[in-house]
Curated annotation (Swiss-Prot):
GO biological-process terms attached to the record: cell wall organization; peptidoglycan biosynthetic process; regulation of cell shape
UniProt similarity note: Belongs to the D-alanine--D-alanine ligase family.
UniProt cofactor note: Binds 2 magnesium or manganese ions per subunit.
Signal peptide: none
Function: Cell wall formation.
Source species: Campylobacter lari (strain RM2100 / D67 / ATCC BAA-1060)
Name of the protein in question: D-alanine--D-alanine ligase
Underlying gene: ddl
Length: 346
């Protein structure tokens, strides 16, 4: 199995995606091709030996082979024309805009390329935090109370303090603020609106229990990772959140009851099946008074949440083997031929 790891793109989380790709170089024990999408949305084939931070920060990637996306795959530009890149399955690890909003999924679907990652509908619903909450509630998964603010509308925050403000279409803890009283609200709104015209406001619950669970469906069976309890802090900032997954070491499993473990898995399955088939996702949950609440869905989790799996490569291989392309629609122009036959040419 040869994987084409797609990363980068024009996103606030561009650099995080590069870190994810570098980690996958270490932990995915399979043949890999690294496909970098730069800020101008040009594709480059990066030699595995050059998969390091300097290649991208210095702009040296521009000296690598350029790729074009066409029906059936990526193609390398050569002096004699184009040569198809040897790749069986693409892996979408573009974080944020372009990768998690459905654009990459749409391209890969359109050009008939097998890929691991959320499909278009799953991307749209999980990229927008407000839509995520509506989706979760529709499948019987609880969420915290929330309100959506829009940059172009005058709206009051009806939730009591403290509350938390999050840009609706951004991950990685970027633009997030905890607001403890009215005096901090305007600044927090200004920060969040710098990144998105829609902002989700939630009640902030201190000393809350948080658990992370990753998984995917292989055939008709759900495969789950261990359950992680992140280290406690009011909120993980950008560096805390992503320096953690930049390491390839495993994490310890949360010390929780079998009953709670099953509750988390049940809620994960409701979120995942069938919308996220073909993707390996991570869900972050809150637990309050033994009740499970969805915090967020990570459709392309950092480094594919490899650190949560005992045998990460085996999970990815089995997921890839079960991915099917969309069925092609038969187009034979029978209708047009029938019109031409009866009434002359159109």
């Amino acid at each position: 199995m040869v994987y084409g790891v797609i990363f980068g793109a024009n996103s606030y989380e561009h650099e995080i995606s590069i870190v994810s790709a570098v980690v996958l170089k270490k932990v995915l024990k399979a043949q890999k091709k690294f496909i970098f999408c730069d800020k101008n949305k040009e594709f480059f084939l990066i030699d595995e030996e050059k998969m390091n931070a300097k290649t991208f920060s210095s702009g040296a990637y521009k000296k690598e082979k350029a790729l074009v996306l066409k029906q059936g795959g990526f193609f390398i530009k050569t002096m004699l024309g184009e040569k198809k890149l040897d790749m069986d399955v693409a892996v979408n690890i573009v974080h944020g805009k372009d990768g998690e909003d459905g654009k990459i999924a749409a391209l890969l679907d359109f050009y008939g390329i097998k890929y691991i990652g959320p499909r278009i509908e799953a991307s749209v619903l999980s990229f927008n935090k407000a839509l995520t909450k509506l989706y979760a509630q529709s499948v019987g998964v609880k969420t915290l109370d929330y309100k959506v603010l829009n940059l172009h509308k005058e709206q009051n925050v009806s939730l009591s303090f403290p509350c938390i403000l999050k840009p609706a279409r951004l991950g990685s803890s970027i633009g997030i603020s905890i607001v403890k009283d009215e005096s901090e609200l305007k600044y927090a709104k200004d920060v969040a609106f710098e990144f998105d015209e829609d902002v989700v406001v939630e009640q902030f619950v201190s000393n809350i229990k948080e658990y992370n669970l990753a998984g995917c469906m292989i055939g008709e069976k759900m495969e789950f990772s261990i359950i992680e309890e992140p280290r406690k802090n009011e909120i993980l900032d950008f560096e805390q959140k992503y320096l953690g997954f930049s390491e390839s070491s495993k994490v310890s499993e949360a010390n929780i009851s079998e009953e709670l473990k099953q509750k988390l898995r049940d809620n994960f399955t409701r979120i995942y099946n069938p919308l996220f088939k073909g993707a390996l996702i991570r869900c972050d949950f809150f637990v309050i008074d033994d009740e499970v609440y969805l915090n967020e869905i990570n459709p392309n989790p950092g480094s594919l949440a490899n650190y949560l799996f005992e045998d990460f490569t085996n999970i990815v291989d089995n997921l890839a083997k079960n991915i099917e392309l969309e069925k092609q629609i038969k187009i034979d122009y029978a209708f047009i031929h029938s019109i031409n036959g009866q009434k002359g040419k159109l």
